[in-house]
Amino acid sequence: MLRLHLLYAAAIFVSSLFAACCIQEAHAWVPHIVTKGNRFFDSASGLEFRMKGVAYYPRPNAGKLYEVDNYDWVTDDHEAVWKPHLDILQELGVNTIRLYSVDPSKSHDKFMCECSKRGIYVLVGMSAPCKNCAISDALPPACYPDELFTRAQMVYNAFAIYDNTLGFSVGNENNLQKLSGKHDGTTTAPCVKAFLRDVRRYASSCVGSLRAVPIGLDIADIPPRAQWLQYYDCCVENDEHSRAEWIGFNPYVECDPKAHTKYAQSEGLRGLMKEYQQAEYPRPLMFGEFGCNLGDNTIDGFQAQRAFYDAKWMNEEKEMTDQIVGGNVFEFTTERIHLKDQKLTKKRDDGKYGIGYFSPDDCDHGKTPCKFVPYPEFANLKTAYTTTTPSTLTMSTYNGTHRKILKCPKQMSIELQPTPTVTLLKCSVAQPVCSGTKANAFKKNPADVIKMGDKKKPSNRGDSNTATDAAKQQNTASNGVRMARSTTGMLSSILLAVAALWLMLL
C-alpha cells in the first residue's frame, strides 16, 4: 500500500510540473507584424509575412440587421456568430481578416484573442456609415468632418492594444467619390490625406503606451494607378505623417478561371504588376480586395465559381511577391441583399462574391441561427492558401526594392486643412489577456513619443522604435526556445527519477 501511495504522489508531482511548464510555454498572442521596405515581417522570427486574407462581414439573410451596412459583428456579445466562422477560416488557411468598420465603444477582446490563437491578424477600418463617420463626397474642407478624427482616436485606442492588429485603414475607395469637384475621384483626396496625417500624428503621440500600428488606406483600382500611389506616398510640409504606411488596391482583374491556369496566362495581373513596378511604391502594397466573379466556370451546378489560382500566385510568383504582400478575398459570405433578386440560387449573379452562403433563407443570427454553407469554390481557395510555399525572406537580409519617396502628382492638390480642433483622447494603456498572456506588453520608451501636431522627418527606413521592438521580440522568441529546451531537460530528469523510484519499490 505504501508503494502505491508513493507512486501516486510521484505521478501527481510530475503531472503538476508538466502542466506548469506547458502553461509557462504557451503564448496566445502572436508576434506583431512590422514593415520594412515594401514587405511585412514577423517581429519575432524575422520571416516575411505573406497575407492570405478574407474580407469579413457576416450579414444575415433576414431580420432587423439584414439591411444594416457595416454593423460590428465581432464584439464579445456576438461570439456565437463569429467563433464558428473562425474555425472555418482557420481550415481555409486564412491568416488575415479585413474588417470594414467597428464599434470602438464595445469590447473585442474575445474575438482578437480567438483570432490570435488561430494565427490570424486583423486589418481594421476606421470609417463607418454613420453621420460624420467617414470622408464624405463633398468639397474640401467639408469632406473631413471634425467628428471623424474623434472616432479615429477611439478606434485606434480600441485596437492598437492587440498584438495581432495588422493595420488600420483610414478609408475605402474614396477615389470613387465623384459627385463634387472634378468628378475624377481626386476632389476629396486632400481630405483623405489630411485625415491620414492626423491619425498618424495621434499614433506617434501614443507610442509611450501603445505600439505604433501601420496606418494606410484602401483604394479602388482605377487608372492612373501611379497617381494614387504617388499622392499617398508623397511628403507634405516635410512631415512623415502625411504618408501612408501601406496601401491597398481593390483589383478585380483575373476573371478567367478556365483559360488562365498559369500565371503567365494572366494578362490582367501581369499588366498590373508591371504598372506597380514602374510606379516604384516603396512601402507594402496589398490587394485590399480581390476575386473577380465574372468567369464562366460551373461546378456542381453552381455558376461562376472562382478558381483562385491568383490567391496562390500572389504569394509565390516572384513578379507578384516583389510588388504586393498578398491580399483579401472578397468575401466570406454572399450578402443576399446585394443579389439581383435577393434570392440565393446556383445561378451567376454580379453581387455574389461569397465563398459560401448562409442557410436557411430566413436566418437572422438570433432566433434563427445562420449556418455557413461553402460553395464549390471554397475548396479552390483552401487549396490555394494551404499549399502556398512559405516565404524564406528574412528581415535582416532584406534591404528594400524601392527606396525613394515618391513626388506629389501636379494634378492633385496638396493643400491640406488643419487638424480638427477636438479634444484629444488619452492614449490607452490597456493590456488585454489571452490564455494568461498580456497583449501590448512590449517595453515602452517615453522618449519615442512625438507631441501631437509635431512633424516627423520623412524616411523610408523602418522607424527605430519599430526596429528595436522587433529585435526585442526576436530575443523573447529565442528565450522561449531556450526555456522550452530547459523545460524538456527538466521533465526528462524528473521522469528518470520517478523510474528509478519505481525500480526501488519493486
Walk through the language-model features, giving the residues of each:
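C-terminal GPI-anchoring signal of eukaryotic secretory precursors
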Residues: K455-I494
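Active-site groove signature of glycoside hydrolases
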Residues: A152-T186, G216-D218
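Substrate-binding cleft of secreted/luminal carbohydrate-active enzymes
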Residues: F290-D296, G301-S413, T419-P420
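Noncatalytic carbohydrate-binding groove/subsite architecture in carbohydrate-active enzymes
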Residues: D184-M314
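Active-site-adjacent substrate/metal-binding segments within catalytic domains
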Residues: A28-R118, Q153-N157
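Short, acidic/polar
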Residues: E67-L89, L148-A158, P224-N238, R306-E316
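N-terminal signal peptide
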Residues: I12-P31, L501-L506
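Aromatic-lined substrate-binding rim segments of carbohydrate-active enzymes
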Residues: E79-P140, T188-D218, Q277
